[in-house]
Curated annotation (Swiss-Prot):
Name of this chain's protein: Small integral membrane protein 17
GO CC term (a single one): membrane
UniProt region (Disordered), positions on chain: 1-84
Source organism superkingdom: Eukaryota
Organism lineage string: Eukaryota, Metazoa, Chordata, Craniata, Vertebrata
Biased composition (Basic and acidic residues): 13-42
Subcellular location: Membrane
Length: 118
C-alpha cells in the first residue's frame, strides 16, 4: 500500500480540514460571480411594444419563425391531401430480414437439418 504524507493522513482523519489542502484556484465556488453574470432577469411581455433594439430583433425573429412554421404546416396539408405518405424502404427491409431470421431459427431449432441425414 502506498504510504501517505502526514498532511494527507490529516486530511483523511479530519475531513473538515481538507479545505486547506486544496490549491487556491481549484476552489471556484468561493470566487465571486463574474461581473457580466450579475445582471438580474427582467420580465418582458410577449406582445409589448418597446423601443429597445434587442427586443425589435427578437420580434423580427419571431415573425420569421412563425412564417417558417406556417410554410411547414402548409406542406404537411398538401401531403395529407394526396392521401398517402411515402415511407422509406428501410423499415420494410428490416421487417423482411427479421422474419427470415426468425423462420431460420425456428427451422434450425426444430430439427430441419436432421431431415437431410437419412
Amino acid at each position: 500500500m502506498q504510504s501517505l504524507r502526514p498532511e494527507q493522513t490529516r486530511g483523511l482523519l479530519e475531513p473538515e480540514r481538507t479545505k486547506t489542502l486544496l490549491p487556491r484556484e481549484s476552489r471556484a465556488w468561493e470566487k465571486p460571480p463574474h461581473p457580466a453574470c450579475t445582471k438580474d432577469w427582467e420580465a418582458v411581455e410577449v406582445g409589448a411594444s418597446s423601443h429597445d433594439s434587442d427586443e425589435k430583433d427578437l420580434s423580427s425573429q419571431e415573425t420569421g419563425l412563425s412564417q417558417e412554421w406556417s410554410s411547414v404546416e402548409e406542406d404537411d396539408e398538401s401531403e395529407g391531401s394526396q392521401g398517402f405518405v411515402e415511407w422509406s424502404k428501410a423499415p420494410q427491409q428490416t421487417t423482411i430480414v427479421l422474419v427470415v431470421c426468425v423462420l431460420f431459427l425456428f427451422l434450425v431449432l426444430t430439427g430441419m437439418p436432421m431431415m437431410f441425414h437419412i
